[in-house]
Amino acid sequence: GAHASRIIFDHDMAIGLEYIDKSNRLRQVRCKNEIVLSLGSYHSPQLLELSGIGDGEHLSTLGIETKHHLNGVGRNLQEHLTINVVQKVKNVKTVNDESKSLSLLKNLFKYLFFKRGLLTLPAAEVGAFVRSKYAEGRPDIQIHFAPAGGEITEDGPVDPEFPCVTSTACFLRPESRGSVHACSKDPKEPPKIKFNFLDTERDVKMMVEAVKIQRNIFQAPGFSAINNGELQPGDSVRTDEEILEFVRENAQTVYHPVGTCRMGSDSEAVVDQFLRVRGIRGLRIADASVFPSIISGNTNAACIMIGERCADFIRTEASAR
């Protein structure tokens, strides 16, 4: 029930944290050794800026006194953008069939008493890393397949009356860079997030190619017995321009934001190789915001690794005191 609002400093040393409790009272807590931020790529840079660490020019527009100028705070935001191809199928049952009325009740019974059936399925049944025609030696597109499908409309997702399967693809190494910045002194006001998706020619080209690769998979001989036509993008979407328009209207994030407090040794870097905030003592960051560039896959395991390394750094330094 606590909401961090500001890091407390003694000159260049982080010594505590100010937070708002569940009763909306402002409280403080002091630390004996150091503080580790693990707020993620959106809120770690926001808390730094609320505490006076960041681009001094931006902080002044918010009326926040600059404690330490770090130009890179909140910059370098990267994210995996995904696009779906939904295929109608026949002669097989999918989650679309098994999640309706009596079938859903049967599956609920199976799960409650036998831990079997529909409710034991993961979100995606199959995954693949593939090399596009633009790949430079290693896979550059990740694909997941789900035994269900729906049509995304302006009013949200619509569950069709017929069985479908879905392929979801993302370009693993996007070039586009965005930003995350505090937009108010109020710690409870969400930061301003600007992704700048599809901001480079290569990113545009790769997302169009991702749609084409997924379509080719569904047209493979192994799918011929169950293929019942494409739901999305649909037969009317054929040219690169039409595919790009479909991507711009339907692409989604995959919740892999990284890079907004990136590691490095240059003037734009926020943390050093030991995860310490540059120019500040007693403050580290251990989350996906420290990634210099997005990894070619899911970010979860890499985040766990960062947490483990942070623990090692703290333990090593503590034993040396």
Per-region residue spans from a language model:
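N-terminal low-complexity, intrinsically disordered patches enriched in charged
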Residues: 81-83, 306, 316
